[in-house]
Amino acid sequence: MSSFPTRVVALYPYRSSFSDDLEFDPGQVIDVVSNLDGDWYTGTYVDSDGNRKIGSFPKDFTEPAEDAVFVERASEMALHQPTPTSAVHSRNSSLGYAPSITRSIKSISNNTEHLGADTESYLSANDFIDSTSEALTKIVDVDTLSAPFGNDSNSRPHSLKNVEKLHTFSAPYTISEETPSCSTENDSLPLTATHTITGGEDAATGAAVTNTTTTHITTSTNTSTVIPSNPNSVFLVDCTHSQCPTDLPNIATTQHSLRYLDNASASAITVLERTHPAASSTMATESSHQSPSADSQAEELSKSQRVAKDDDPFVVSNTANSDEPASSSKPAKPLTDLNRAFSQRLNLDPQKPGKSQGEISEQEEDEYDDAESDEMHSPYSTHEPESEPEDQDEPSEKDDENKDVEEEQEQEQEEEQIDPEEAKRIALRERMAKMSGGIGMHVFGLPGLAAPIGRKNTLRRTPAKSSEEAKSTTNDSSPPKDSSSTSTQPTEQSNAQQAPSPKEEERPLPSEPSQNQPAEYRDTPDTPRNIMPLPGLMSADQPIKVTEPSNDADKAIVAEGPNNEEETKGPVIPETQETSEQQVHKTPSPEKQKVLSPPPIITNFDKETLASNEAHEAVPQKPSAPQVTRLMAPQDSSSVVTPSPTSLLDPARAVRKVIDGIDPPKEAGAGATADVESAANSPITPPRTWHSPDFTSKSFEPIERKLPSRISEVTEDSIDEDKQNEVDPSTSARALPPPGLRFGKVDTLASLAHDDLDDLPAVPRIFSPPPLPKTPSGEFGDNEFMFPKKSNRVRGHQSRPSTGSQLRNVVPVSIVTSGGRPALPDEMASPSSSIGHPLPSPPPADFNSLNVDFYEPHSYLESPAPEPQPSYEEESFNATVIHAPTPSTATFQGHPTISNVATPPLKQDVTESKASPVADASATHQSSTGLTQEITQLGSNMRLPTKLTRPSNDGRKASGPRPAAPPSIPPPLPVSNILSSPTSEPPKDHPPSAPLSKPVSTSPAAPLARVPPVPKLSSKAPPVPLPSADAPPIPVPSTAPPVPIPTSTPPVPKSSSGAPSAPPPVPAPSSEIPSIPAPSGAPPVPAPSGIPPVPKPSVAAPPVPKPSVAVPPVPAPSGAPPVPKPSVAAPPVPVPSGAPPVPKPSVAAPPVPAPSGAPPVPKPSVAAPPVPAPSSGIPPVPKPAAGVPPVPPPSEAPPVPKPSVGVPPVPPPSTAPPVPTPSAGLPPVPVPTAKAPPVPAPSSEAPSVSTPRSSVPSPHSNASPSPTSSSMASAAPARTSVSRSKSKAERHETSTSSRKSSKSGEHHHHHNEGHADSSSTRTSLAHQDSRKSLHRHLSRSSSRASKKPSIVSTTGPFNESFSAKPVEPCASEKWWLNSTAVPKSVVQMNDSVLYMIKEGITGQDKKYKSVHILFPDYSQTVLTATFNPHNQNITQLSQLQLAPPAQPSKARLDEEYACYGSTILKKARAYQGSMVGDGSAFTFVNSVMSILAHNLEPINKQTFGGVIYKNVGNVTVQQIGEIRPGDIVTFDKAKFSGQKGTLRSKYSLEVGKPMHYGIISEWDVSKLKIRVLEQGRESKKVSVASYKFGDLKSGEVTVWRVMRRSWLGWN
């Protein structure tokens, strides 16, 4: 059951040449009456004239109407046709014989091409084929089925449509019961058995019918059979009888059946024309029980023969064909190849007409003898009496007259009968034979046992005889009654004898009896080589003597026997022995004396010999030496026959030697046949001429390639035997090659010239060996390739390098790794082996450092290759093991060391390498360099697939293999060896090294007894430019140079024992100076416990400004005197390169007086709070967090700031010195006033100071940081903030510098351990949470200070190839709070994009709003805002790009067309003749699409949906789906040029300047032409225009299918 609409609308015009088809134009509404099988409908409509039309039409030309109702109805054939069982009467008596069904068809129709297809489709559709039926008969009207096909549709169901005409007869037809369906007697006689097909009554006349034809088949006199009235019918007879011949070809199609029957009929008629009238009378007698008169039957049969000869009709193939004796009034006609093949298929002897093996009755044999005797005494017979045997070999005159006609018939029949597959093989073998010099056909005929002579006779569509049948069948020489004991020669020789040469003479058989004497295998010159005699033909004591051939070209080797009296040409096949007397006194019949010889093999290439006629004749030989012409396979080379030098000219030998040089057989006997067959099936055998190097002009010796692929060795005996068998070419010009083929090495390619190499015979690609490696000597490494040296290889290597170096003689080195690096190969270069290496050898010094022990090469070569073991200690040799560290370790573990197997304790463990320090870095580096060079050279020589890489040292996991440095370039120094020398300086731009296990020893600086002059800066340190007024100050580095002390100042003691007992009182600070709070982010620095040494300033460290800028005054508590500060005594403090310039203070510090009573610099007992760093925001600093030490009390003096790195710090005294009085001449330290530059206000544009990690105080440092300047300290606001814009590199440098300064402080400031311990403890506790607490505090303070929303905006990666680009998020508009609002940047895009808004909830207190912006190429930019509806200030904005969707499939396009296609077409046609909008093309298309719902609107007037068809100047054409009415078409600068109209007038048209749009109303597939509804091009009204895609010369034409939004995922 199938559903169909009740009403359809025509999309395309339909025209048909059939009168019962319904023709219509586009837009026609058709009422569907019924549906037909094969996508056809039957419908009706009323035309414009009021006439109702009805007919069938294809449904592909229509579409369902809008008001159509789909109904379900059975197919027309199922409704109107009877059941299959009413047309077949079957009996279940032949189950299992369905595979042997043979179809026979008789037809007089001229149109047989469509007959087979229609008949099979009809039978398969009705399921009429019943394998259980004994005979199946169907009638098919030929006139109906042979009607021409329509031109409009390829899927028209002709056979289904004409089903109504098939049942013109009311009753089915079956095979009559009186006559068996297939009998043995009918098979043995020609055209005497008639299958009488009976049936019911004619539907029109009511008379009984029988499906037979009187003009072709003799009918029976049965009363139940009547000749049918309708001759134009086809009879299908399927024979399933158990006695049917099973060797008939299985014809699959009706067309094959017709062709087969045509050929079989022609052969049967040809046989009947040559039969004797007695045979006709015999057949009439045999069929007398079926016909009233034998004479009338014979007359009717002769009439049918003449008609069959003229009309060449088809004949039922299951009637047997046989040859009858020749008539006395008509000379016999020789059998053709087709007739012979047909008779052989029916098991008939081709030389004995009317004979069937084992199936002829005694009556038939008597009739045969009578007919034979009549033929012998007939004056018209070609057979002469026994007394005149000399004239029997003359051909008849009738044969000469009909010779040309027979040849033409044979050629036509051969062309029709040759199977295509067999024809290909014939053509291939003929081509190979011609290439091989003309005689290779005898060799290439071996595969498949197809003889080269008369080979086309065996290529009929009849089964070939089996080997047992060929041995059991006999030749014509024996009497008919002894058929059971006779034997026949092979099929090849039978065919060869049946096609004689016109110049060959026929000679009678020898009268002497032949004795059963077995003979060995011999070769004869005039027969194909490799001849094997049949058993039972020669006696055991009858030798075959071979004489030396003479110099004459027309003579060959003559075989001699006991009787040498008579000579005969060609091969002699003796009769089967009955008795010697019978063979001596009996004269054979003339048919038995016509024994033809095959053409000889020509082995002489002399032009005179080829031109002579004698070269085509057989050489006489002795009659007593029987000879058999069966082709045998090449045997072993143990033949006694002496070969001649021309045997080497046999192309088969050359081909065999070339092929066996590549892939010789394992055994000589079996492999020879297989290789010959392979060579015969190979189409790449080259031609061989006298100019080819395969044949030398002197010795006729073929030169073969020397290929090292399993070449079989040849012993000296076999080579000597070959030399003995060679004969001078002048002794004989014609000889056969030896039966066995021997394969040996003759010459190599090195003995040939370069020009000769190009002419060498090609070899099939399948036998081509792999390319051989070249040795240094330039020859092919045959011995190496055949017998490779056994070695202990490391698993994973597949090939060995073939170089001339000493790598093969070196011990393989096994690499034992703890990681995943690949193992090295089994060869390693020695220090002296530099020959053939791509890279130079490493120096001996580096190589000796490897500590590798090599053993003697001979032990490696002589030892057999053991199986690969998991452990290398069981090897018989001293293997060298290299232990390398794991590349994935987090820290540097040292360099790999090489240890000998004999010293296992030297193996370094991976876990120990982490904690073990590097003792000698230079020695390790040297070993590492040598190892790297050695491994690199090994990897380069051994063709490692991957290189070795150095393990990672930065704490990350190593990725990939270790890179190898060239041997000539030393690898870079390890990180831990950079500061291995006390005097070595780190390289420029080198990352700081890891701390060493031992501190670097430096000389401490001596304390100053007086105020020293300002030290000069190094020449490498550039001066610091003066800072600007707006630049914020920077903090002073963690260390600073010592403050110079006047000469009268007592020296600072080096130990705590010299400290004063009590500190002097400190004056109270001024009220204007605020106290400096300790921020949570800056850890306090404890008081120094000692005097640090003056380190050497770094090269990259810039100079530090004067102490007047870098050292601010120490705020003193109330009552404490101010601390004197020298202005010029301190050396400059180096400032990092990345720090901003330090502002110059407005008030200069006064110089420090040098009286004798000047007190020393007071030393505070506790650490002073650190100075906060400037920030861009500078919020107020809160109270210190937990863990931060409080501000020191006023009774204690503040600490002395520590200078930067590279400047010695101020040596503080253990106790505070007394404050100088004005009477002493020391002015007090001035307090900064309002004249000091204020700290710049926080702003978003002010750059934040990024302090390098080297200038940040270390958590383990004992020196306190110093503020940047006195003005900054005094004018610092109450609240500040710290910027955290520091990169990873800066933090890494900070940590490295902190560790170094910590170790340095511990080493040089151990004299004040108490203060150091207390300060270190507080600092470490404060440093743990300083960063996190400061960040949290800054976040809270920032939110309190400014109520602006904190918006984080992220943008994903965007592909430049798409149109989608990032847009401005417009965060200040807060568009995400309004459901319908979009960013202003999206609104400004106007019609160039489409956008869609999505909203949702992602979690608790989290909402999102997404704006999908669609660009013309359908790529999208998705702008998403995630926010908290309760707290709108916290928002996250993100943008990402979406690629265009995939191209829609055909099924999706069909669905989209079903949604919008009909609606668009109907709306567009409604506008035809009127103006839409402003009259532009886009307005018309946009107005039509505006009525649709859920579709994608046009974007930027460029895209309208999915692309169906795209043509760019007829150069690039892309078609995805079928163009249909209702699709949108766009023209962009398109130019059409061509011819149109009935007069083929030229036209030129330009469309699309600017872009033009339209809606397709019609589409002609054959012309590639569209009709478009458009407006705005020629007029402002909607009109129809046509365009041909084939006339497009330039520009672009695109057809769009309107798509739904779901295609983009928009719901």
Swiss-Prot record:
Residue ranges with Acidic residues bias: 361-373, 387-420
SUPFAM superfamilies in the record: SH3-domain (SSF50044)
Biased composition (Basic and acidic residues): 300-312, 421-433, 605-619
Basic residues compositional bias, start-end: 1300-1312
A Pfam family the protein falls into: AIM3_BBC1_C
GO MF term list: myosin I binding
Amino acid composition bias (Low complexity), ranges on this chain: 472-494, 637-648, 1242-1278, 1340-1350
Keyword Cytoplasm set for record: yes
This protein's record includes keyword ATP-binding: no
Record localization: Cytoplasm
Region feature (Disordered): 275-648, 662-741, 762-851, 886-1365
Pro residues composition bias: residue spans: 963-974, 1022-1053, 1076-1241
Cellular-component GO terms for this entry: actin cortical patch; cell division site; cell tip; cytosol
Ranges where the SH3 domain occurs: 3-67
CDD domains (alphabetical): SH3_Bbc1 (cd11887)
Keywords noted in UniProt: Cytoplasm, Phosphoprotein, SH3 domain
Modification sites for Phosphoserine: 1258, 1261, 1266, 1379
Positions of modified residues (Phosphothreonine): 1380
PANTHER family: NEUTROPHIL CYTOSOLIC FACTOR 2, NEUTROPHIL NADPH OXIDASE FACTOR 2, SH3 DOMAIN-CONTAINING PROTEIN C23A1.17
Name of the protein in question: SH3 domain-containing protein C23A1.17
Organism from which the protein derives: Schizosaccharomyces pombe (strain 972 / ATCC 24843)
Lineage: Eukaryota, Fungi, Dikarya, Ascomycota, Taphrinomycotina
